[in-house]
């Protein structure tokens, strides 16, 4: 089945994430390269990176995902904040290159009452200043649509991808899709439209989260797997979809390591049962 893991902290050292993966039976994971609510980034010593690379090779932990800071806004109404976002993304590109990580998930941003059209243009303008010459894959995340948030429908994401001068990809988030009004019990209908307008091959990462908030609420509140208003079966409709095989599945549910281990085991068990039937 797809590689599966969760969001992990690197506060105790980048190499410690591999040990955490082994604890919870994960074969991938996601992390922040800097303070997710700010811009500060820890300088990671080469010795720590080398240890990380050694351990991930030994234990076959791959398709690791780096998630950009929440505070970066490529379509801010302030030019200084737009420039800062580009600067931080480029710094992150260099950092993940050193870690030999390709997948980078990015929230597209909020237009701050400038309007959807202007916001999308600013996102493209900023994205075009990012250096991905070493093969990094920037994955625009599907968003819930709260406030002036962009990226909450296929057409908006298609505009960004089709107008950018660098290759872009997509991370689909089950909670965000549900909250933005996408029915996951009819997920193949969504994939059909996505394939027509963007191409399913552009989907590179799956965030698997249940939702605390009701369908179409445009609010981003994650719940534990199968314990929210989406439910286990509709989440399986997404993560077990044949058209999305080989994409890393990342849990961002409100859990500690023990909770993530239980969810990962539950998902693997259901996948194996499905394969046997």
UniProtKB/Swiss-Prot annotation:
<feature type="binding site">
    <location>
        <position position="222"/>
    </location>
    <ligand>
        <name>Zn(2+) 3</name>
    </ligand>
</feature>
<feature type="binding site">
    <location>
        <position position="141"/>
    </location>
    <ligand>
        <name>Zn(2+) 1</name>
    </ligand>
</feature>
<feature type="binding site">
    <location>
        <position position="67"/>
    </location>
    <ligand>
        <name>Zn(2+) 1</name>
    </ligand>
</feature>
<dbReference type="GO" id="GO:0008270">
    <property type="term" value="F:zinc ion binding"/>
</dbReference>
<keyword id="KW-0227">DNA damage</keyword>
<keyword id="KW-0378">Hydrolase</keyword>
<dbReference type="GO" id="GO:0006284">
    <property type="term" value="P:base-excision repair"/>
</dbReference>
<dbReference type="InterPro" id="IPR013022">
    <property type="entry name" value="Xyl_isomerase-like_TIM-brl"/>
</dbReference>
<feature type="binding site">
    <location>
        <position position="176"/>
    </location>
    <ligand>
        <name>Zn(2+) 3</name>
    </ligand>
</feature>
<dbReference type="InterPro" id="IPR001719">
    <property type="entry name" value="AP_endonuc_2"/>
</dbReference>
<feature type="binding site">
    <location>
        <position position="207"/>
    </location>
    <ligand>
        <name>Zn(2+) 2</name>
    </ligand>
</feature>
<dbReference type="GO" id="GO:0008081">
    <property type="term" value="F:phosphoric diester hydrolase activity"/>
</dbReference>
<keyword id="KW-0255">Endonuclease</keyword>
<feature type="binding site">
    <location>
        <position position="252"/>
    </location>
    <ligand>
        <name>Zn(2+) 2</name>
    </ligand>
</feature>
<keyword id="KW-0479">Metal-binding</keyword>
<dbReference type="GO" id="GO:0008833">
    <property type="term" value="F:deoxyribonuclease IV (phage-T4-induced) activity"/>
</dbReference>
<keyword id="KW-0234">DNA repair</keyword>
<feature type="binding site">
    <location>
        <position position="107"/>
    </location>
    <ligand>
        <name>Zn(2+) 1</name>
    </ligand>
</feature>
<comment type="similarity">
    <text>Belongs to the AP endonuclease 2 family.</text>
</comment>
<dbReference type="InterPro" id="IPR018246">
    <property type="entry name" value="AP_endonuc_F2_Zn_BS"/>
</dbReference>
<protein>
    <recommendedName>
        <fullName>Probable endonuclease 4</fullName>
        <ecNumber>3.1.21.2</ecNumber>
    </recommendedName>
</protein>
<dbReference type="InterPro" id="IPR036237">
    <property type="entry name" value="Xyl_isomerase-like_sf"/>
</dbReference>
<feature type="binding site">
    <location>
        <position position="141"/>
    </location>
    <ligand>
        <name>Zn(2+) 2</name>
    </ligand>
</feature>
<dbReference type="Pfam" id="PF01261">
    <property type="entry name" value="AP_endonuc_2"/>
</dbReference>
<dbReference type="GO" id="GO:0003677">
    <property type="term" value="F:DNA binding"/>
</dbReference>
<dbReference type="GO" id="GO:0003906">
    <property type="term" value="F:DNA-(apurinic or apyrimidinic site) endonuclease activity"/>
</dbReference>
<feature type="binding site">
    <location>
        <position position="173"/>
    </location>
    <ligand>
        <name>Zn(2+) 2</name>
    </ligand>
</feature>
<keyword id="KW-0862">Zinc</keyword>
<comment type="function">
    <text>Endonuclease IV plays a role in DNA repair. It cleaves phosphodiester bonds at apurinic or apyrimidinic (AP) sites, generating a 3'-hydroxyl group and a 5'-terminal sugar phosphate.</text>
</comment>
<keyword id="KW-0540">Nuclease</keyword>
<feature type="binding site">
    <location>
        <position position="220"/>
    </location>
    <ligand>
        <name>Zn(2+) 3</name>
    </ligand>
</feature>
């Amino acid at each position: 089945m797809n590689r599966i893991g969760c969001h992990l902290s690197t506060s105790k050292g980048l190499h410690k994430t591999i040990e955490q993966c082994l604890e919870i039976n994960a074969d991938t994971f996601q992390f922040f390269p800097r303070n997710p609510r700010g811009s500060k980034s820890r300088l990671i010593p080469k010795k720590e990176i080398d240890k990380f690379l050694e351990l991930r090779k030994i234990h076959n932990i791959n398709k690791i995902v780096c998630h950009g800071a929440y505070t970066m806004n490529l379509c801010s109404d302030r030019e200084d904040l737009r420039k800062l976002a580009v600067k931080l993304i480029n710094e992150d590109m260099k950092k993940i290159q050193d870690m030999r990580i390709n997948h980078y998930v990015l929230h597209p941003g909020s237009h701050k009452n400038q309007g959807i059209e202007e916001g999308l243009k600013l996102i493209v303008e900023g994205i075009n200043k990012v250096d991905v010459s070493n093969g990094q894959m920037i994955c625009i995340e599907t968003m819930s649509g709260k406030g002036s948030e962009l990226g909450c429908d296929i057409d908006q994401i298609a505009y960004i991808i089709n107008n950018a001068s660098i290759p872009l990809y997509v991370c689909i988030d089950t909670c965000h899709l549900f909250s933005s009004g996408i029915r996951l019990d009819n997920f193949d209908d969504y994939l059909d439209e996505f394939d027509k307008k963007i191409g399913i091959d552009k989907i590179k990462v799956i965030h698997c989260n249940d939702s605390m908030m009701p369908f179409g609420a445009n609010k981003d509140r994650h719940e534990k797997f199968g314990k929210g208003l989406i439910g286990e079966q509709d989440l399986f409709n997404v993560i077990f979809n044949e058209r999305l095989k080989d994409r890393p599945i990342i849990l961002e549910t409100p859990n500690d390591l023990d909770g993530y281990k239980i969810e990962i085991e539950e998902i693997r068990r259901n996948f194996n049962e499905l394969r046997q039937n």
